A protein has these predicted regions:
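Short, amphipathic alpha-helical "recognition" segments used to contact nucleic acids or chromatin
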Residues: 8-32
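DNA-recognition alpha helix
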Residues: 35-46
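Major-groove recognition helix of helix-turn-helix-like DNA-binding domains
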Residues: 47-72
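Mobile, glycine- and charge-enriched loop segments
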Residues: 75-106
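Beta-strand-turn-beta hairpins that frame and shape the catalytic cleft
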Residues: 84-94, 219-229, 269
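Core catalytic region of metal-dependent phosphoesterases/phosphodiesterases
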Residues: 96, 101-209
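Short acidic low-complexity segments
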Residues: 206-224
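Conserved beta-sheet core of the metallophosphoesterase superfamily
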Residues: 227-323
Length: 325
């Protein structure tokens, strides 16, 4: 029997007032628990009313209570909650981080994709900084070599679209989360805008089911071996794996961290798997890394594959795809 059954509109005498159960509920919930209201209605109607029926009707009328059972007396916020990151339900997923097109390492990316294709992987997550957007950088400009020109925005976007198209020839679905480089576009626009602008720029506006761009900076893989948080965190630490270990303890799940251009794997203090998945950009093409010395660690290329629910961390030297191809 549904909550809209006729007895909800049956005239009753309750609390010395002639009313109906539906109308009585609208004020009674302010002072009574659902169990108490069910008992009062059972007595007034001469039939058994279950507390869960009262709860369902109360909720359908928008009469909310707190977790402690108190009535919610303030108007609910009309603004969205940001608690639904993109989720991939699979045991086999490829993660590419910091590709930074048009400065990608084509050979490295090709080797990684070849292995993923060999293993029958259908989904890839782009873990932030898919685009470099050098032309939108707010960093100080530099001197150019005599035969060098600065990248134009149109050329960067075109290269990103070509890379995206190539991915879709190997994978059924691409999930792209944001990184700090994509945020350069927002800083230049100086306004909040939909991720659909990136969809259009990459030429994927008619392919939104296969090439998904999320406003989140992380995604979650729901695998048979647990939850795996693929993230492009705000922080980039000098000590490899530090950010990932802290995030694993904060969110209580396995973590694959991008952004730091570091590489390695470990476990968190609570025993969760942590990986810094390296970058897919060609470090030799990054002016800030090559033209001036710094004390930051050497950039490490890499990629991550969840294969049959288990982690495989790839590296050009220490774990090359050729080991499995």
């Amino acid at each position: 029997m549904s909550p809209s059954s006729s007895w909800w509109d049956t005239p009753i005498n309750i609390d010395e007032t002639a009313t109906t159960p539906r109308e009585w509920l609208q004020t009674a919930y302010l002072r009574m628990s659902d169990v108490a209201m069910a008992e009062a209605l059972s007595k007034a109607l001469g039939r058994r009313v279950l507390a869960n029926r009262v709860t369902l009707m109360r909720q359908r009328q928008g009469l909310q209570k707190t977790t402690s059972g108190q009535p919610v007396v303030f108007q609910e916020s009309t603004f969205p909650k940001f608690n639904e990151p993109p989720t991939v339900q699979a045991d086999d997923v490829l993660v590419l981080a910091d590709v930074e097109v048009p400065f990608q390492d084509a050979a490295w990316c090709s080797d990684v994709v070849a292995l993923a294709h060999e293993w029958g992987i259908k989904t890839v997550i782009l873990a932030g900084d898919f685009l470099h957007l050098d032309s939108l950088s707010s960093f100080a400009k530099r001197f150019l070599a005599l035969d060098e020109t600065e990248p134009e925005l149109s050329a960067e976007i075109e290269a990103g679209g070509l890379f995206a198209d190539r991915l879709l020839t190997y994978f059924d679905k691409v999930v792209m989360v944001l990184g700090n480089h994509e945020a350069r576009l927002l800083r230049r626009l100086e306004l909040a805008t939909s991720v659909k602008i990136l969809q259009r720029l990459l030429g994927q506006q008619f392919n939104e089911e296969r090439f998904v761009i999320s406003p989140y900076y992380h995604a979650v893989i729901e695998a048979s071996t647990g939850q795996w948080r693929v993230t492009h965190p705000k922080e980039a630490r000098k000590i490899p794996l530090t950010a990932g270990r802290e995030l694993a303890e904060k969110y209580l799940m396995n973590v694959i961290a991008a952004h730091g251009h570091d590489w390695g794997e470990t476990t968190s203090p609570s025993g969760r798997y942590v990986a810094a998945c390296g970058c897919c950009v060609d470090p030799a093409r990054l002016d800030y890394a090559m033209l001036r010395d710094s004390t930051r660690p050497v950039m490490q290329q890499g990629a991550f594959i969840l294969h049959e629910g288990l982690p495989v961390l790839l590296h050009p030297k220490y774990a090359p795809p050729s080991m499995w191809l």
